[in-house]
Each structure stands twice: as structure tokens, then as C-alpha cells.
């Protein structure tokens, strides 16, 4: 099973951006975690990150066309991007929304995600381990 692990704006800065919120794991470490977990579970994992919304939309369309499952950290786009939400709604396979921090324990403008309503499930506040848990969930659903 193919799984796209898609990451939105500023996640390429993991390890240096607000380590008190996002931890010290780098983006390269996150990619390795996802790929290693995917290998252990027999998943074909494709990990991508972008700061350009149109690029994320293209990847979501690609996943929809291929019937691939998605682990998505939409980052700031989760709070306001109807375009990202609508692209997620096109997916035919499961979508797990992941946030490294607990968005409900942060500033009020971060409490709502427009993506959550079209996601199969949401994991937040568990650090980068949320990605691993999302991949385990998708593998279990596939069996």
C-alpha cells in the first residue's frame, strides 16, 4: 500500500523552529522515521514537504488519483485553507491529520482545523510519534 506523508509550511525547519513547541527532531529525522516505519509495516511511504500551497494541492490530487492513503500535517493551512480541505475531500483512501503540537492547547486561532472534518482521524500533541502512530493505523486498516 502506498502512503503519502505530506507536510505543510515551515515543517522543513523542524529542529530549529520553536524547539520548545515542536521538539528537536529535524525534518531529515522525521523523513527517516516515516520511511523506517513504513518498511517495518510493508508500506511504500512517500514523504514530502512544501511551503507552497499549490504544490500540496497537486500532491493531494495525485494521492486521490492513485487511491493512496495520506498522513497530512497541513500546519498553518489547517486553520484556514478551504482549498486544502477540498483537496482532502477528494481522497478515496484514509486520511490521517497529524499535528506535532497539541493545537487545542495553543493560541485560540490554532484550535480549529478545517481539514479535520474530512479526515479519517486526527492525532495531535504526541510529537513526531504521531506520524508513526498514523502509519501503524493505516497499515492495520489495510490488513
Swiss-Prot record:
Domain of life, per lineage: Bacteria
Keyword Zinc-finger: no
EC numbers, comma separated: 4.2.1.10
SUPFAM superfamilies assigned to the protein according to its UniProt record, in alphabetical order: Type II 3-dehydroquinate dehydratase (SSF52304)
Keyword Repeat listed: no
UniProt binding sites for substrate: 73, 79, 86, 100-101, 110
Pathway: Metabolic intermediate biosynthesis; chorismate biosynthesis; chorismate from D-erythrose 4-phosphate and phosphoenolpyruvate: step 3/7
Keywords, comma-separated and alphabetical: Amino-acid biosynthesis, Aromatic amino acid biosynthesis, Lyase
UniProt-annotated site: Transition state stabilizer, residues: 17
Example of a GO MF term: 3-dehydroquinate dehydratase activity
GO term, biological process aspect, one: amino acid biosynthetic process
Record's catalysed reaction(s): 3-dehydroquinate = 3-dehydroshikimate + H2O
Active-site residue list: 22, 99
Subunit structure: Homododecamer.
Primary role: Catalyzes a trans-dehydration via an enolate intermediate.
Annotated family: Belongs to the type-II 3-dehydroquinase family.
Matching HAMAP family: AroQ
Name of the protein in question: 3-dehydroquinate dehydratase
Species of origin: Salinispora arenicola (strain CNS-205)
Organism placement in taxonomy: Bacteria, Bacillati, Actinomycetota, Actinomycetes, Micromonosporales
Amino acid at each position: 500500500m502506498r502512503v503519502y506523508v505530506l507536510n505543510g509550511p515551515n515543517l522543513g525547519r523542524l529542529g530549529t523552529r520553536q524547539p520548545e513547541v515542536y521538539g528537536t527532531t529535524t525534518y531529515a529525522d522525521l523523513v527517516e522515521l516515516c520511511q523506517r516505519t513504513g518498511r517495518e509495516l510493508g508500506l511504500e511511504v512517500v514523504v514530502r514537504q512544501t511551503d507552497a500551497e499549490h504544490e500540496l494541492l497537486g500532491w493531494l490530487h495525485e494521492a486521490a488519483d492513485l487511491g493512496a492513503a495520506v498522513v497530512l500535517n497541513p500546519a498553518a493551512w489547517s486553520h484556514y485553507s478551504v482549498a486544502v480541505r477540498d483537496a482532502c475531500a477528494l481522497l478515496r483512501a484514509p486520511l490521517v491529520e497529524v499535528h506535532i503540537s497539541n493545537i487545542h492547547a495553543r493560541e485560540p486561532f490554532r484550535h480549529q482545523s478545517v481539514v479535520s472534518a474530512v479526515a479519517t482521524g486526527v492525532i495531535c500533541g504526541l510529537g513526531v510519534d504521531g506520524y508513526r502512530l498514523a502509519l501503524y493505523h493505516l497499515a492495520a486498516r489495510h490488513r
